[in-house]
């Protein structure tokens, strides 16, 4: 898994960088992208602007470091999930995983707000766009590792991953307005994905 952020000046993250990131993330969550400026971060962190810029030379570098705080946590959580087993109860295993992923987006509201801000920023910022592209590639690789034992072929696996990730991401945004429960959707998505994983492409 890749990470874009390395602290400036060869320094490891310390209390000051953590404070800057805490303040910046709070500003992004409460004020949105347009309320997040280096000067505002410095003010809220009780630091000088030059001190903030010592650790983060530009707003783009700060945005990427902030993204690492959240997005890498998601990758780590997913990577720690054991792969599914090709043995019995494949449906139950897959359903449990998908239910967990769908529920995660609903329960961690702060994280979801940060994600949504980054999706919006990426439409205007090439650095953030590149970061998200790398993140989703990494996420696809991790997801493929988890689903691979159930897949009949590489093609079937690739299609399944391409179904799961966009659906889960979109569900976190739209679920509150959907007419069906998360349990119903988990079951339906499990059926669709499992059928795809079992498709023979020979």
Swiss-Prot record:
Residues 14-74 form the HTH tetR-type domain. Signal peptide: none annotated. GO terms for molecular function: DNA-binding transcription factor activity; transcription cis-regulatory region binding. PROSITE patterns: HTH_TETR_2 (PS50977). Gene3D superfamilies: Tetracycline Repressor, domain 2. SUPFAM superfamilies: Homeodomain-like, Tetracyclin repressor-like, C-terminal domain. It comes from the Bacteria. Keywords: DNA-binding, Transcription, Transcription regulation. This is Uncharacterized HTH-type transcriptional regulator in dhlA 5'region. It comes from Xanthobacter autotrophicus. The lineage of its organism: Bacteria, Pseudomonadati, Pseudomonadota, Alphaproteobacteria, Hyphomicrobiales.
